[in-house]
Amino acid sequence: TWAYTDDLPSVKLGETDYTKTKPNGRHGATNENVKRYIDFAAENGLDQVLVEGWNEGWEDWFGHSKDYVFDFVTPYPDFDVKMLNEYAKSKGVKLMMHHETSASVRNYERHMDKAYQFMVDNGYNAVKSGYVGNMIPRGEHHYGQWMNNHYLYAVTKAADYKICVNAHEAVRPTGLCRTYPNLIGNESARGTEYEAFGGSKPFHTT
C-alpha cells in the first residue's frame, strides 16, 4: 500500500494531522527504504530513482471522486524531502518526483505552480504525473481534447521551471515532444502493470 496509516477512513488536506496517527508498517516511501534504493542506483549506474507514495493523501485517493486529494508538496512524516535529495546528490543520483492526480485535473492545475516550485527548491528536475480514475470534471476523458489541452499546459508550465515530464495514463505520443523536449515520455500502452489487476489477453501487444 502507498498509504501511511490505516487509522483514517478518509483524509482532509490541511486538516488531517498525520503526526497523531500510527504508521501502518506497509508504507514504502520511507527514509530508510529510499536511501536503500538510492544506494542500489549508485552501485549499479542508475542516475535517477522514482519514489511514489511520498505525499499525504493516499488513504482514500482512488474510487471516491474527490476533487481535492493531493497538494503535491506535503510529505508524510517518514519522508524527509531535503535530507533524501541531499543524500541522493552525495551518491551522484537524483530523485524523480511523482504527482498522482487521482484524475482530478482541476486540482492539479490549481497546485501546479506551487508543486513545480517545490520541485525546483528541493533539487528535482523530473516528474512522473499520473491520472488514474475517472476524470474530474465529469464528462471529460483521458484522450479527449480537454485533456490534450491539459497535457500541453502541464508540459509548457514545466518548461518554465526547467522540469521534465513523464506522463502516465496520458494520451499516446502526438509529436509534442519535438516542440517541448522536456516531455520525455508518455506511458500510454497497456503494460505489465495490468497483470496486477486482471491481466492482458494473450493476443494483446504493446
Name what the model sees in each region:
Residues T1-K91, H99:
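Conserved structural scaffold segments of CAZyme catalytic domains across common CAZy folds
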